[in-house]
UniProtKB/Swiss-Prot annotation:
It is an enzyme of class 3 (hydrolase). The keyword Lipid metabolism does not apply. Belongs to the peptidase A1 family. Disulfide bonds join C159-C162, C165-C239, C186-C204, C191-C199, C278-C470, C389-C431. The active site is at D149, D350. The keyword DNA damage does not apply. GO terms for biological process: proteolysis. Residues 1-19 form the signal peptide. The gene is ASPG2. This is Protein ASPARTIC PROTEASE IN GUARD CELL 2. Aspartic protease that may be involved in drought avoidance through abscisic acid signaling. It comes from Arabidopsis thaliana. Disruption phenotype: No effect on stomatal closure.
Length: 470
């Protein structure tokens, strides 16, 4: 499929305090007539592209965008966009339900509630997985595609015997053929990490309910995961025998949320809770990366304190204080991004949400600030969730104002142009890639994170941006 690709001259600009002498570009240039890029829907050779450094405690995996799967086909760019925005709307709704505690119950009554532990609820919604990794499960390792989810505290794969399974790209994992599979017993310390854990024939059972009512249910186990030559033993993993509502060929999910049962939490002894990622830009044939270990924390990054929400400990909240357009800070209502004592509002960084959502008052002011500085550009009708679009079909290049996030304690992140003005069809229509949130919660989505080195220092409670682009 042919997708428009535009070029930007100025990539990423960060400084450590608002009083820094470092100046910011007020405008960037978009080359509207950059030749379209053909995206080949084939899978890369992960035998060569997921790797680790055996001389360190650094584990690295390649990230693959869902559009690279051969099973994903779209008639055109317009169809691709609308499918992505439908997933995105579902994802946002699921996160809001998760934080509010309103999760749609499973309709499958063949597993009794008292057979399982309490729900480990993920922010991931049906069909919203955007990025995948390739991981070897068991001994010998069977390679599986797994969705990464920064809002989930669970690692799981579909398992035989499969009472109810969705279609996946690889054969369903069979624990009977793994020499390292060990079931977790009731009353064990691992099972106790799931509140009110349930038992079945002496084994620990789990149930993960997602925001739309999809789920995975099965047995909790300890298993070996392999990344190329790196072997990680005794990972607490769900072996799902009943799974409904998953998507696009993934075998399961690699949760990298803030809880102790996530992959990040389980590796904290070796990695200090440190990890980072570079999300591949949409519409390219390249792969991103997911790195675990202290070496994922680069020198020269700009660090922002993480904010903990006891009501939603899986999610990574950050302190956001303001927004800028063209070097001008936009006036916003006081406290519009604050996390309240009751756990409402705040700003979440999420890998599964595509488009950044802002509270309505902040979004309107931000959007209007951008519109006022792009009044010379011809407008187009809104597309999907976007209400601010431009007809750039008659242009060779366009000068646009920069967009910036002002974080707590001073750091400023100025986005590359492709992260805030995106093509939505094959006819030169570009849209301002932000949307209003239905509540006071803000979500920084993966479109705004693309191509930026993002690092999490869980031990010290910081998230870093840069210094590199990727």
């Amino acid at each position: 499929m042919l997708l428009p690709l535009f070029f930007f001259f100025l990539h990423l600009h960060l400084h450590l305090s608002s009083s820094s002498s470092i100046s910011f570009p007020d405008f960037q240039i978009i080359d509207v007539l950059q030749p379209p890029l053909t995206v080949t829907a084939t899978l890369p050779d992960f035998n060569n592209t997921h790797f680790s450094d055996e001389s360190s405690s650094k584990y690295t995996l390649r990230l693959l965008h869902r559009d690279r799967f051969p099973s994903v086909t779209y008639r055109n760019h317009h169809h691709r966009l609308h499918a992505r925005m439908r997933r995105d709307t579902d994802r946002v709704s699921a996160i809001l339900r998760r934080i509010s505690g309103k999760v749609i119950p499973s309709s499958d009554s063949r597993y009794e509630v008292n057979d399982f532990g309490s729900d480990i609820v993920s922010g991931m919604d049906q069909g919203s997985g955007e990025y995948f990794v390739r991981i070897g499960v068991g001994s010998p390792p069977r390679d599986q595609y797994m969705v990464i989810d920064s809002g989930s505290d669970m690692v799981w794969v579909q398992c035989q015997p499969c009472k109810l399974c969705y279609k996946q790209s690889d054969p369903v994992f069979d624990p009977a053929k793994s020499g390292s599979y060990t079931g977790v017993s009731c009353g064990s310390s691992v099972c106790d990490r799931i509140e009110n854990s349930g038992c079945h024939s002496g084994g620990c059972r789990y149930e993960v309910m997602y925001g739309d009512g999809s789920y995975t249910k099965g047995t909790l186990a300890l298993e070996t995961l392999t990344f190329a030559k790196t072997v990680v033993r005794n990972v607490a993993m769900g072996c799902g025998h009943r799974n409904r509502g998953m998507f696009i060929g993934a075998a399961g999910l690699l949760g990298i949320g803030g809880g102790s049962m996530s992959f990040v939490g389980q590796l904290s002894g070796q990695t200090g809770g440190a990890f980072g990622y570079c999300l591949v830009s949409r519409g390219t044939d390249s792969t991103g990366s997911l790195v675990f270990g202290r070496e994922a924390l680069p020198v020269g990054a700009s660090w922002v304190p993480l904010v903990r929400n006891p009501r939603a400990p899986s999610f990574y909240y950050v302190g956001l204080k303001g927004l800028g357009v063209g070097g001008v800070r936009i006036p916003l209502p006081d406290g519009v991004f604050d996390l309240t004592e009751t756990g409402d509002g705040g700003v979440v960084m999420d890998t599964g949400t595509a488009v950044t959502r802002l509270p309505t008052a902040a979004y309107v002011a931000f959007r209007d600030g951008f519109k006022s500085q792009t009044a010379n550009l011809p407008r187009a009708s809104g597309v999907s969730i976007f209400d601010t679009c431009y007809d750039l079909s008659g242009f060779v290049s366009v000068r646009v104002p920069t967009v910036s996030f002002y974080f707590t304690e001073g750091p400023v992140l100025t986005l590359p142009a492709r992260n805030f003005l995106m093509p939505v069809d094959d006819s030169g229509t570009y849209c301002f890639a932000f949307a209003a949130s239905p509540t006071g919660l803000s979500i920084i989505g993966n479109i705004q994170q693309e191509g930026i080195q993002v690092s999490f220092d869980g031990a010290n409670g910081f998230v870093g941006f840069g210094p590199n682009v990727c």
